[in-house]
Amino acid sequence: MASEVPYASGMPIKKIGHRSVDSSGGTTSSALKGAIQLGITHTVGSLSTKPESDVLMQDFHMVESIFFPSEGSNLTPAHHYNAFRFKTYAPVAFRYFWELFGIRPDDYLYSLCSEPLIELCSSGASGSLFYVSSDDEFIVKTVRHKEAEFLQKLLPGYYINLNQNPRTLLPKFYGLYCVQTGGKNIRIVVMNNLLPRSVKMHIKYDLKGSTYRRRASQKEREKPLPTFKDLDFLQDIPDGLFLDADVHNALCKTLQRDCLVLQSFKIMDYSLLMSIHNIDHAQREPLSSETQYSVDTRRPAPQKALYSTAMESIQGEARRGGTMETDDHMGGIPARNSKGERLLLYIGIIDILQSYRFVKKLEHSWKALIHDGDTVSVHRPGFYAEWFQRFMCNTVFKKIPLKPSPSKKLRSGSSFSQRAGSSGNSCITYQPLVSGEHKAQVTTKAEVEPGVHLGCPDVLPQTPPLEEISEGSPTPDPSFSPLVEETLQMLTTSVDNSEYMGNGDFLPTRLQAQQDAVNTVCHSKTRSNPENNVGLITLDNDCEVLTTLTPDTGRILSKLHTVQPKGKITFCMGIHVAHLALKHRQGNNHKIRIIAFVGNPVEDNEKNLVKLAKCLKKEKVNVDIINFGEEEVNTEKLTAFVNTLNGKDGTGSHLVTVPPGPSLADALISFPILAGEGGAMMGLGASDFEFGVDPSADPELALVLRVFMEEQRQRQEEEARQAAAASAAEAGIATTGTEDSDDALLKMTISQQEFGHTGLPDLSSMTEEEKIVCAMQMSLQGAEFGLAESADIDASSAMDTSEPAKEEDDYDVMQDPEFLQSVLENLPGVDPNNEAIRNAVGSLASQATKDSKKDKKEEDKK
């Protein structure tokens, strides 16, 4: 709701977010801009009188305040605005940041205060205002109280990170201030400017790596330069953006390091802001008075801050060399699209000032992740970081493949056409496993017509095969081997991390192609049955167990990306270790399946493979093998291995042979490894919907609802056993017999059903809106539904569960409806405008206020 505050004229005006509007609807931010410049002028001047010294911890908590009356004072000049107070947070610490980025205090002062700040028309959804300095060097943004508070807590760690590595895509903060006027606190932060106004931006994206509700709204599209989102990017640029290999490696390395920093602070839901300048389009555009400044008409002013451009923010060595034909990158990262057009990319990570614990309170309850809250708090930011990096480095940014020589093109084209056949169309054939003369083999064939990519000479349809790559370029290749069960699966993935894993015949390398395929397999298996578990084992000489069996695919993927090529593949030993890992955890209704990715020559002879297959057959173990990259060497051996496993039935185990191509994961989709023997894709909505939730639409919700109900069932059974044992002890009856305990459990269960269990919500009978309301109530009321106490959790180790923190967090969330609204907008499946949710938020806010008043009264009585 809009509130009314007095302003300079004495007339009440409306206040929406940080933006003040008068009765005519016009924005009146000139007073705010003037107050900011007056305050910064005084702060920089007073800071120059302080001696330079090492930064101490107390410097991060220092707050300086100065009052600016309208008539002026001994320390402040007179002005025509309302009287205001200006606060400066951690001035000494921020002075160190200036020095780190090569900014002199007089340059900082001149940029921000020599000329009026320029207001940008694109304000945030929360009502935040954006100003840019006249020289395009700095951005001034208004932030919420929670964001400013979080930045204060972030500063010590931020200081350490920048001290170790000033080249980062994270926001570079140069100052945090607060203007107190008219009974309101307006907090502002000064940052580096990612998008210079001197370069015309043709399109802009805000990317998270998610597809849920990630499309620009119609209102956003009507803006002069709209900010598009992930689905728009996948539609507009499906092939991604192509960078030189050195630039791509430097960018991905910087993203990985920055995401690790954000993960350590438990920050998630950040985005990559990317604005694209098309050099070829700019040269063809006619110049006019209405056109924005083009590249040729106005050059950027000299930079005052180091490492402030996108190109400087990644590795410095990537600035030299490469194949891009631009004379002046103007701070942008050179790239190409699939048409071969030259681009300049201006990128940076944004929206990092949101504490993860508030989102966790709502989102985790909505997802019904009840137990092991501390583990979830640590792993979910890690999973988000892993997902974010994967999307950026594999989908958004890609390497420009090397050009083979004409003679090598001829050789690769002839060998490729022999694989593809004469039709010229893509085809996938599957031959079922049978004993005898039939071989168990799946082959993916594809042929690319010549001339398809004539518009993009630097983007090739196929990377040259291994034998045609120069000797100086290492080419390792990945392989994995997972374990799966048919009804309830416990999957151990055996990863081939031998020396062949860097080969580039699978894009971008065998190792990364394997990682994407393992990701697809693990998600398919866990979605087909939420009780399935997955493990990860390497197939190198050591056969290292990276993760034990777990349903957390985020943990699997996190470990997966730490694998580096080394040594040789030990196929037999790896399969044996995977079998032992599964056998140790096998349940009565579990079937064991191993899925092995093999991307290196198998040195084990056929005799040993057949012997191993016979042993596995006795143990009723099925093995699926994805053979890629070395099909000519491995196919005969692995076919004999799989045929021995299948025996006379000819079913159960599978061998998939995939020749080099653009996507290993896509080649597996239609095969029985994912689709099952019946051909229905596992984990993609083929089964009936439990709890009224489509697993393909929201797999996480389907999983956690099932886990939640299973945990409740187990808890009730355990309580029934304890109660039965206590009753038997009182009656003097021995409790050693299993039949007696089972009877007691049955009676207790029947008794509970008769009298009902009032502490737990009945999710099966709730509508979607009621489930959302219930989740919000659970998140803010703690243990009311019997969810806070668990014998498996050490209460002292759980995060944010202490009572004082709970009261403070709940109070802050409920007293900041704008923040709560922004959190709800980012939750999957939640419509914040739904009447049921709005009523729930209102009732929770009023309840939180009543509880706080009640607690204060009790404290006063004491």
Swiss-Prot record:
Compositionally biased spans, kind Low complexity: 412-424, 722-731
Signal sequence residues: none
Tissue note: Testis-specific.
InterPro entries assigned: PInositol-4-P-4/5-kinase_C_sf (IPR027483), PInositol-4-P-4/5-kinase_core (IPR002498), PInositol-4-P-5-kinase_N (IPR027484), PInositol-4/5-P-5/4-kinase (IPR023610), PSMD4_RAZUL-like (IPR049590), VWF_A (IPR002035), vWFA_dom_sf (IPR036465)
Record GO biological process: phosphatidylinositol phosphate biosynthetic process
Biased composition (Basic and acidic residues): 850-862
Protein name as catalogued: Putative PIP5K1A and PSMD4-like protein
Species assigned in the record: Homo sapiens
This protein's encoding gene: PIPSL
